[in-house]
Every structure is written in C-alpha cells, then in structure tokens.
Amino acid sequence: MIDPAIESHYGIGYERSRLFPGGRPTLEFVRSMELLDRLLPAPPARVLDAGGGPGTYAAPLARRGYQVHLVDPVGLHVEQARQAGSDPAAAFTAALGDARELSEPAESQDVVLLFGPLYHLTGAADRQRALAEARRVLRPGGRVLAMAVCRFASLLDGLYQGWLDDPAFRPLVDQDLIDGQHRNPDPVGRPEFFTTAYFHTPDGLLAEAEQAGFGGVCVYGVEGPGWPLRREWSDPHRREQILFAARAAETQPSLIGFSHHLIAAGVKA
C-alpha cells in the first residue's frame, strides 16, 4: 500500500508537530488554512481528507463545523488522528485508507483534500488514480484541493540552508531538477531531506488536475517567496510582510515556483 521509505520516514512521528515548532504555526500551515478558508464551501460541508496524516487540517476544519473523515495509509498517523478527533470541540473520524482506492460512495463528498497523495505517489498513473477517485466521490459542484511540493523546493532549501555542497543532498537536487523524482537514501537519519516523493512544476500540477476532468483549475503558491525567512517569522511585523508577499505572489505565473508547496483547486462539473 505504501512505499517502505515513506512509512519509515513518517514512522518517526515528527509529522504531528512539524507545522507547530515550539507550539507556533508555520507559514505553510497559516497559508494553507487561509486558502482553505477562502476556497471551501461553508460548513457543515462534508470533507474527505485523503492522506490527511495525523489530522493537521482535519482538526481545525472540524472545529469550524465541517463534517470531516480522514484516511491515511500510515498506521501511526491514523492513531494520532483518532486521538485528535476525540476532542468534542473538533470531532472527526479517521481510518486506514489509500487515496487510489477510496471506500466512500460516489457523489458523497462536498470537498476532497489531497494534501499528501500527489507528492508521495511517484508514478503519473497512480496520481491520476487518486485524482479520479477524488472526482468519483465528489458530488457535482464539489471541490478538490490537491497539494504538491514544488519542483524547485530542494534547490531553494539547499541554497538557503547551505546544503548544496553536502554530498548527501546535492544529488537529490540534481535529480529533482531533471524529473522531479526525489529520493532520500536515508529518510530516517536525515528526515530534513524528506523522503520518496514526486515534485511538480506548477504547470505540471495544473495539467494533471485538468487531465482528471476537473474544471476551473487554479494553482496557488502556498508560502510565496518568504518561506526561507524562518527566524523573521517569529517577529509579528515581519510575519505580516511575509504573508503579504505570499498573497501577492500566489497566482503570479513567474512567482508561483518560489513557493515550497502548491495547491491546485478545481471543481467537478
């Protein structure tokens, strides 16, 4: 069901706290929630969070009044998600599942989130299966929001972190730029280099969503050009500047690729 390298990477358990270092939300989380708040229909819409991890987005959406069900192929994530979903103020359900073969009935969901499957499914055919399944379970007019990692994420991260001379990292960057196939040979020992994944170009993500039959597809840059400014993010004034830049750049074709993550939003006709 899941690549062993991916399972071992997430088996470390760090994903639950990754977007909240020191208890504070990161730019990635803040901007992703901002886009969800803007693009989702009003609660109590039904949301299927396919590949939803430990409930990072399911919990706040449930707290807003959405009816959320999460599926994920990693057992630890499902266990953590069930713990998060047991809070009466943010209740949601969670189960083991694969975005390529959803158990939900056809036309049963208002929203499908794919915040993980499109970058961990490294083959184009598998990504199309996940998108087709999302389309199948959506009602007419329902929305898909699919997250991707940008093709240039390792290049920019390596530049700002000083990793481009690291012999364990540079080959990853070179391969990412060739075909987007990201392979970290040590996903447990060097989790900061991520794990097995496919990194999209903005145009490639758009094309895949349209190929799956979604209409009105728009690709958004999530973090914008300011995501390397991690220390500045803790300063409220600088934080607002970073968010301003992200919002200004989110759909500009020449700037989308500076974001670490992309979100494609589309509608089932």
Give each language-model segment a name:
Residues 100-112:
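A short acidic, Gly/Pro-enriched loop at the edge of an enzyme's catalytic core
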Residues 1-51, 56, 60, 80, 143-179:
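Conserved class I S-adenosyl-L-methionine
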Residues 121, 189-203:
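Acceptor-substrate binding/catalytic loop of class I
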Residues 56-101:
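Class I SAM-dependent methyltransferase SAM/SAH-binding core
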Residues 208, 212-269:
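C-terminal lobe and adjacent flexible extensions of AdoMet/dcAdoMet transferase-like proteins
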Residues 128-140:
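A short glycine-rich, Lys/Arg-flanked "PGG" loop and its adjoining helix->strand segment in the class I
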